[in-house]
Amino acid sequence: MTNLNYQQTHFVMSAPDIRHLPSDCGIEVAFAGRSNAGKSSALNTLTNQKSLARTSKTPGRTQLINLFEVVDGKRLVDLPGYGYAEVPEEMKRKWQRALGEYLEKRQSLQGLVVLMDIRHPLKDLDQQMIQWAVESNIQVLVLLTKADKLASGARKAQLNMVREAVLAFNGDVQVEAFSSLKKQGVDKLRQKLDSWFSELAPVEEIQDGE
């Protein structure tokens, strides 16, 4: 398994939907989460760059699919944040269509990182994202972000509760606590990404099994 240098990650492009993404080849790992789940902070912490992914004081501002390249043919995909109350209903539906379309149709997608505030995990849309991924045979890493906001005992209790809950999806779903502030869980995230990026995209296997 190759240990990739995530500090080399650089921005490639933004796209309004899957049709505007570059060719569907190589390996992609997508990051998804509610608009206030700390997705941008996690990407910046992973890559040790302060402003790779722009953090916004206004949740719901990031409406585009943002692509970052780690090395040639290996990309991180920052999906639009979802579930923010003040976003108009039509825009919410548009985002959800874009997210669903990407998860179901993108052949180069190898893994999905779903970020949730450890204090408010497994909201309806979080569960929908995991369900979509499992149904598409995509491995999932759930990061319970802002873990530094809870004392050690409460943090472990939340982690165990979510680990128990995701068993119901009957898929490959791993759960870890994460804190951008304290750099907690960053090594686990890098290890998971390294393993995903080391795998061959499973396109042929899917076609052979049909």
UniProtKB/Swiss-Prot annotation:
Pfam families: MMR_HSR1 (PF01926)
Domain of life: Bacteria
Segments forming a coiled coil: none
Required cofactor(s): Mg(2+)
Ranges where the EngB-type G domain occurs: 25-199
GO molecular-function terms, A-Z: GTP binding; metal ion binding
Alphabetical UniProt keywords: Cell cycle, Cell division, GTP-binding, Magnesium, Metal-binding, Nucleotide-binding, Septation
Classification via NCBIfam families: GTPase_YsxC
Protein name: Probable GTP-binding protein EngB
Species per Swiss-Prot/TrEMBL record: Salmonella typhimurium (strain LT2 / SGSC1412 / ATCC 700720)
Protein encoded by which gene: engB
